[in-house]
Amino acid sequence: MKILLYGGSFDPPHNGHLNNLRAAAERVHPDKIVVMPAGTSPFKQGTNASGALRLEMCRCFAALAQEPGMPPLEVSGWEVAQAAAGSRNYTVLTLEMLARENPGAVLYLAIGSDMLLSFEGWHRWQDILRIARVVVTSRDIGDAPALHAKAKLLDPSGGRILFAPVQALPMASSQLRARLAAGEECEAELPEEVRSVIRREGLYRNTEGSSR
């Protein structure tokens, strides 16, 4: 069984996230996808929406499972629950949990190309590569040589870091938060399920977007 993990702050989740996950799934053809919003990211100062609301907004990913050729998809609140209990979130711990709960499964981790360039800063990054294969969604923006050089440095033997080409969508959560704070709806960038939660809760209004 092949399981593809896709994590992030998802503050808010947007169509670029869906596009990246679709590309990663098409690259490795998993039997199951697990979308995991972070409780508290080690790389960010905080999130604008609570873990519970980001988890609710991530239900928008379920639409991918209805597309031809896509596997079942689970939106997991495990990291959000860990953070609520006072635990620090690290990707390697999530992968270890998935490995325990799915003995014999082949694990994949989908990340963006910017994350690969900073991968050595991840907690126990060597163990991440031991436990899972990393699928990098790579946009055609001229950074391919640097990405492949980085992959060779991190994984000299090859086979643990894969690339999934993806059409670049010009959006980032920080930019969307700023536009939402200015009163825009961002209909082209945000699924209706996400916009519905934002409207209901009044999220991102009169707040500055902090980090992507």
Please place each PLM-identified region on the residue numbering.
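Nucleotidyltransferase catalytic core that binds NTPs
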Residues: 1-212
